Amino acid sequence: NPTRTALETCLAGLEGGDFGLCFASGMAAIDTVLRLFSPGDHILAGNDVYGGTFRLFEVVLRPLGLDFTFVDSTDLASGAAGLRSNTRLIWLETPSNPLLGVVDLPGVAQLSSSNAVTGKRPLVAVDNTFATPYLQRPLELGADIVVHSATKYLGGHSDVVGGAVVVNDPDLHARLAFLQNAAGAVPGPQDCFLVLRGVKTLPVRMDRHA
């Protein structure tokens, strides 16, 4: 849909990314990212993630074979101790919802790149819902994947539900775009229009929030 394409392009630009994908909700976006991984893969996550994210990880995905460890994401030593040879993803929220924990993203990116435990670098995914790209652009700080619930500050008017993923890597984008199409959890044109409308006032609203 051209309106969805316009929103995907807009959000990718705001995040300083090359590719954007939009979804029917933030949880649909998160679920799509987690579908990149296979049974036996390990995901390291913050211990204060959004409750819906925790439920998806623990109640839905763990029984399907994904393994999760939750650590204090504000403590790099805790994160380093949680890495395993099969860690494929580091999942972060910063600020976290609802405790507003702040993560050292460049530090985590370095931890991922220099991980001596595994020969395969884990991807770093950041839920940027609370900061928005107005206050923080995780791709510029070393993240591979940025996720949003557009329902909150991007939409900004409490009248739309949506989600988004932004990446730079073309192969990663192709895999996520296939999953987006295969699962079909995409927003309708009106929802995309409402988020595009909301983005126009994002700087004014975030200035007042901050």
Predicted regions and their residues:
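A glycine-/small-polar-enriched, mobile loop at the entrance of the PLP active site in fold-type I
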Residues: 1-13
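Conserved PLP-enzyme active-site core in the AAT-like
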Residues: 19-210
